[in-house]
Amino acid sequence: MTAILERRESTSLWGRFCNWITSTENRLYIGWFGVLMIPTLLTATSVFIIAFIAAPPVDIDGIREPVSGSLLYGNNIISGAIIPTSAAIGLHFYPIWEAASVDEWLYNGGPYELIVLHFLLGVACYMGREWELSFRLGMRPWIAVAYSAPVAAATAVFLIYPIGQGSFSDGMPLGISGTFNFMIVFQAEHNILMHPFHMLGVAGVFGGSLFSAMHGSLVTSSLIRETTENESANEGYRFGQEEETYNIVAAHGYFGRLIFQYASFNNSRSLHFFLAAWPVVGIWFTALGISTMAFNLNGFNFNQSVVDSQGRVINTWADIINRANLGMEVMHERNAHNFPLDLASVEAPSING
């Protein structure tokens, strides 16, 4: 009998670190993208919590009229927000060391830029980490591709839109009421409800919710019975078991009779591809729509498109929406503008008869 002894090669500290970072045996996979993701998301989260609680008012419009957003300055969970960086800063990179003091940095909304840039870097790295773990496990890359939809949406409202409008002050505030304010002002200035890419996004989100509910209810309703009629069907299964617990043929037959034969899937892979692709493609289109409207390529304008034989306007829903848009635009940033852009750009009517 011959014993073969091999000398174990001593791994350097860097080598052990690399093995630990890329190990799929860890309880939570870190990965090289995680090395950047963890500090950026921790920074964004920490600054968000501190600023949401205690940040002083921010001069968002750059006109020396600070807006309060934190809890300690009179807000609640609904009205509170991280106020976007001041219009006086524009698109300038504004870290703490660029300000004369921390007070000035806070007054100009420095925390918003810090949170947004770290957050976007962090979620992009999370997407890369999904791909990295899939790669190391020999999986296909579509999980990261699906996650690219919310990443694209966040990038559109927090980065692309401010770039197109020329200032981080036009970015979406980080709060509940601030989000609604952003949506209302966006509609007023860009008529997003009349943009086909937004319509595709609505179809994607609502359709995805509908298909998810339909799929989940069908699967949980078409169990393969492993028990008798006298005991619960749940007794026939173990959590996490390898064997399938439902019959796709039965679900296909049920749904085919409920609507019509070709409205249901009899192939599990094509079904789940559809469930993933529908909302993802819809959200991609919405992000693309926000990114085009950032540069003022706005929704369709059908205002005053129907007139009678005398040339009088017959209002359509497009005119009703336009009237609402003008009202919203008049009311936002009241002290920063004398007139909304749509009204100020029209020639004054003749008054000499």
UniProtKB/Swiss-Prot annotation:
The free-text function statement in the UniProt record for this protein reads:
Photosystem II (PSII) is a light-driven water:plastoquinone oxidoreductase that uses light energy to abstract electrons from H(2)O, generating O(2) and a proton gradient subsequently used for ATP formation. It consists of a core antenna complex that captures photons, and an electron transfer chain that converts photonic excitation into a charge separation. The D1/D2 (PsbA/PsbD) reaction center heterodimer binds P680, the primary electron donor of PSII as well as several subsequent electron acceptors.
Which processes are annotated in GO (biological process)? photosynthetic electron transport in photosystem II; response to herbicide
Q: Do you know which NCBIfam families this protein is assigned to?
A: psbA
State the name under which the record lists this protein.
Photosystem II protein D1
Gene encoding the protein: psbA
Q: Identify the CDD domains for this entry.
A: Photosystem-II_D1
The UniProt annotation places chlorophyll a PD1 binding at 198
Site (Tyrosine radical intermediate) location in chain? 161
> What InterPro entries is this protein classified in?
D1/D2, Photo_II_D1/D2_sf, Photo_RC_L/M, Photo_RC_L/M_CS, PSII_D1
The record's cofactor note says: The D1/D2 heterodimer binds P680, chlorophylls that are the primary electron donor of PSII, and subsequent electron acceptors. It shares a non-heme iron and each subunit binds pheophytin, quinone, additional chlorophylls, carotenoids and lipids. D1 provides most of the ligands for the Mn4-Ca-O5 cluster of the oxygen-evolving complex (OEC). There is also a Cl(-1) ion associated with D1 and D2, which is required for oxygen evolution. The PSII complex binds additional chlorophylls, carotenoids and specific lipids.
Origin organism is: Phalaenopsis aphrodite subsp. formosana (Moth orchid)
Q: What is the lineage of its organism?
A: Eukaryota, Viridiplantae, Streptophyta, Embryophyta, Tracheophyta
Question: Post-translational modification, briefly?
Answer: Tyr-161 forms a radical intermediate that is referred to as redox-active TyrZ, YZ or Y-Z. C-terminally processed by CTPA; processing is essential to allow assembly of the oxygen-evolving complex and thus photosynthetic growth.
Q: What domain of life? A: Eukaryota
Residues bearing PTM N-acetylthreonine: 2
Site residues by UniProt (Cleavage): 344-345
Can you tell me which residues bind a quinone? 215, 264-265
Mind listing the GO molecular function terms for this protein?
A: chlorophyll binding; electron transporter, transferring electrons within the cyclic electron transport pathway of photosynthesis activity; iron ion binding; oxidoreductase activity, acting on diphenols and related substances as donors, oxygen as acceptor; oxygen evolving activity
The entry marks the following residues as binding chlorophyll a ChlzD1, namely 118
> Recorded E.C. number(s)?
1.10.3.9
Instruction: Name the PANTHER family for this protein.
Output: PHOTOSYSTEM II D2 PROTEIN (PTHR33149:SF12), PHOTOSYSTEM II PROTEIN D1 (PTHR33149)
Q: Name one GO cellular component term.
A: photosystem II
List of residues binding Fe cation? 215, 272
